């Protein structure tokens, strides 16, 4: 069984849409464009018989088949497709909490592991101040070169955040990393949090 949940309300709604397509055996295909990146988008498309890919995972529902894209499937873990009625009729929603989370392991390249921890552990905390940090480069000495943005750019606490928060977390998670360096122009204090 797939990691995605399609509620009964969503299944009923989609079955009604599919019945209007006048194509016997038509189903849906669920996929994510740019999975594991900040630009990931979860999509549902009509899937006529034969349009599915051989590596897709079929999920047999009562009145149609949902084909899950093989590349997207790990990013669809805990995803829920639902349909909620409202005064305007209703709305199909797709919640895929892992769509933008990169899939990394200890064998992944260093820059991918750094980006993973920046996105999953560091940036959620910085977001409360309207800020974020991104990886610019990893230099030969094993130093991650980072750039602050948003409320962190020009913030008086950026040095403390860099050394006591970001560097400690990254060194703990990635032993071969030797340190971090900030290349942000902090003279621009327009959006600074502190």
Swiss-Prot record:
Its cofactor is [4Fe-4S] cluster. This is Fe/S biogenesis protein NfuA. Belongs to the NfuA family. It comes from Ectopseudomonas mendocina (strain ymp). One of its GO terms (biological process) is iron-sulfur cluster assembly. Keywords: 4Fe-4S, Iron, Iron-sulfur, Metal-binding. Binds 1 [4Fe-4S] cluster per subunit. The cluster is presumably bound at the interface of two monomers. Homodimer. Signal peptide: none annotated. Involved in iron-sulfur cluster biogenesis. Binds a 4Fe-4S cluster, can transfer this cluster to apoproteins, and thereby intervenes in the maturation of Fe/S proteins. Could also act as a scaffold/chaperone for damaged Fe/S proteins. The keyword Metal-binding applies. [4Fe-4S] cluster binds at residues 152, 155. It comes from the Bacteria. HAMAP family: Fe_S_biogen_NfuA. One of its GO terms (molecular function) is iron ion binding. InterPro entries: Fe/S_biogenesis_protein_NfuA, FeS_biogenesis, FSCA_dom_sf, HesB-like_dom_sf, NIF_FeS_clus_asmbl_NifU_C.
